[in-house]
């Protein structure tokens, strides 16, 4: 049946469509942190995230990156290819910040000589623990070839994103991606790309991402609107 709720997430709900290989993602006006321990309704956030993510995924598709994105169909809705999500949060870091700085006792804002790719096991009960390649294989999440592909694709996506954000005066600090298997068993980029799952700093070092909510730095939607406007001007 179409339009049946399949999954309720922190930032969006997923519904079935008439096509068994296509889902509808509906973005919500909700901001969370600490794995959902703190929740807040922020009017307009869903519209902004849907617009930003749609724009980024359109550009990734055009650049030859295989993604689940099909098209945006309303202010808060988009159609996506149905995938089986790989239970990994794939984090790429260009600059020290957040949990990385805390874990290794280093200040924020240091450029990393080489971008670092990290894996976190997607499991709310375990608070998404930091894991390595051997853990990924032990948990039967992915094999060596799949791990290598995910890392390679993440680095390729990073180079594209860094260039786009540099063009609009924003520094891409780090970001989180999720991948999934499509109906043919191919690994493709899934989920979303918005200031919810990346860190962006402007030329003055101001946070242009969800850290505004995490650190109570001001209006989240005001910041997201600036990011959207900048992206809309990207050539």
UniProtKB/Swiss-Prot annotation:
It catalyses: 5-amino-1-(5-phospho-D-ribosyl)imidazole-4-carboxylate + L-aspartate + ATP = (2S)-2-[5-amino-1-(5-phospho-beta-D-ribosyl)imidazole-4-carboxamido]succinate + ADP + phosphate + 2 H(+). The lineage of its organism: Bacteria, Bacillati, Bacillota, Bacilli, Lactobacillales. It comes from Streptococcus thermophilus (strain ATCC BAA-250 / LMG 18311). SUPFAM superfamilies: SAICAR synthase-like (SSF56104). One of its GO terms (molecular function) is ATP binding. Keywords: ATP-binding, Ligase, Nucleotide-binding, Purine biosynthesis. CDD domains: SAICAR_synt_PurC. Coiled coil: none annotated. It is an enzyme of class 6 (ligase). InterPro entries: SAICAR_synt/ADE2_N, SAICAR_synt_PurC, SAICAR_synth, SAICAR_synthetase, SAICAR_synthetase_CS. The keyword ATP-binding applies. Belongs to the SAICAR synthetase family. PANTHER family: MULTIFUNCTIONAL PROTEIN ADE2 (PTHR43599), SI:DKEY-6E2.2 (PTHR43599:SF3). Pathway: Purine metabolism; IMP biosynthesis via de novo pathway; 5-amino-1-(5-phospho-D-ribosyl)imidazole-4-carboxamide from 5-amino-1-(5-phospho-D-ribosyl)imidazole-4-carboxylate: step 1/2. GO terms for biological process: 'de novo' IMP biosynthetic process; cobalamin biosynthetic process. This is Phosphoribosylaminoimidazole-succinocarboxamide synthase. Its EC number is 6.3.2.6. The gene is purC.
